[in-house]
Amino acid sequence: MQHFFADPSCVDGEQIRLAGSDVNHMKNVLRMKPGEEVWISDGEGTDYFCKVEGYEEKEAVLRVVKKEVSQTELASRLILFQGLPKGEKMEWIVQKAVELGAYCIVPFAAKRSVVKLDQKKAGKKRERWQAIAKGAAEQSKRGSVPQVRNVMSFREAMNYAKELDVVLVPYELQEGMKATEAVISKIEPGQSVGIFIGPEGGFDESEIDQAKETGAIPITLGKRILRTETAGLTTLSILMYHLECREQLEDKNIK
């Protein structure tokens, strides 16, 4: 079933008036007709099961059949700090990170980043990445659209991460899977977690030292060297599994 996002202001009791590019997609691409069903999320934790009533000028008019609290968001905020990769890899990373439950994605320029973006190019890239995030959120039935932040320097990204409960830095020279397991096992639902991923070539040693000084925890993801587009998604997958298992266990204990 199709899934779209609407601003809460579009919701008026038992009716939603959807505007913007999604209307053209519904009407002319999907050719949705009156009576067809669709899910609408307001981005603030409420999902609406609706039926299409019709189209008026630049709006799609939907009738709310039922509403419910979104069940697809993690209890924790997982923030992916991604060192700028080459080519179009960032688009793929954004898409998959959203599917895996990332709350926010922060691109940053590391010492070994090959890609250099001026302010104008960075702005255009961010618009593109945000559009991809929205599409991925709709496809994966997310209750909200994760934000892609402006490109930061490594220092700016570290300062941004200071307010988080836990900050993890997968690092190829770090050893000890037991230590990684111990760190992740202590993460509780509701905590905010930052994940720092280096670009191609990894982190410079001085960046790891700086990360440690701010309280970040270097971890290993195993014996193999992962690509920049794989490392973050691997970490998100591990955290998603851990947190959802903890949530289910807590729900079971409450019942």
What are these regions (language model features)?
Residues 71-168:
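RNA substrate-binding interface of SAM-dependent RNA methyltransferases
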Residues 35, 97, 133, 211, ...:
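Residue-level signal for inorganic ion chemistry
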Residues 204-255:
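Structured adenosyl-cofactor binding patch, chiefly the S-adenosyl-L-methionine
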Residues 62, 145-149, 218:
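Generic structural signal for residues in well-ordered beta-strands
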Residues 122-126, 186, 237-238:
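Short, hinge-like loop/turn segments at secondary-structure boundaries
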Residues 165-202, 206-208, 216-219:
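Active-site/ligand-binding-proximal alpha/beta "capping" segment
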Residues 9, 67, 109-112, 223-224:
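Short, ordered loop/turn segments at secondary-structure junctions
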Residues 1-69:
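N-terminal positively charged helical leader segments and presequences
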